[in-house]
Amino acid sequence: MEAQDILSCVEPFTAARPAELEVLGRTAVRVRKTPASILCHDGQLADGLYIVLRGRINLVRAVDGNRDLILSSLGPGEVFGENCAMPGMVMSTTAVAAVQSEMLRIPGEALSEHLRREPETVVRLMRLQYEKLREVEAVASGLALCDVEQRLRRTLARLARRQGRRNPASAGWILAPVPTQSELARMVGSCRETVSRTLSAMARNGLVSGSGRRMILNDSLVNETP
């Protein structure tokens, strides 16, 4: 698929004029990363807006000691690095490829020029940033107010709504590839062993099922979890 066609399907560019998308698409570069590769560091100037085409990118923040917390896990169609359009703004997280990943990178200067010509993209970009801020606030409030099972339910439901698809065979959502138990632990501020026990209990209660990198989430888990 051509870069222009990709941009037309991805927020914040869905309302931009085709001619403007063609101009922006000519500046785009495809980037491929192997698992555990770092795209940009916390505190570093963002070198562009990235659109995830394939794979999964974790946005990570270092916490006390040698631990880190995954604030967001992005799949195909999701973006990061949008603050590159604002001179002097740095990344607030470290972006790490969780699996083999491919992205489309839009240089910051090209994005800034596009925003000057397309005010609707500006509005959609602001909405996108607001939604990301709300997600980070939800993670923070979960760490402070919820136990591990509640945090894990919220995390899985959020991933299913953003990256999952309806299961045509039965009621539920398919999440594939699902993050590893170690990644889930870093998303909920716990350890892998606790997450493993919690997932087993949820499976016994019929909330989740599956094997390997594929998980099916019960409708009640996705629909009733904030």
Predicted feature descriptions by range:
Residues 134, 141-144, 148:
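Signal-transducing alpha-helical linker
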Residues 21, 111-112, 222-223:
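A generic structural signal for short hydrophobic patches within well-formed alpha-helices
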Residues 72-130, 134:
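Cyclic-nucleotide recognition modules
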Residues 1-35, 79, 84-85:
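Cyclic nucleotide-binding regulatory module and flanking cytosolic helices
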Residues 148, 155, 159-226:
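Phosphate-/nucleic-acid-contacting segments
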Residues 12, 37-100:
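Cyclic nucleotide-binding regulatory domains
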Residues 22-23, 39-43, 169:
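Short loop/turn motifs at secondary-structure junctions and domain boundaries
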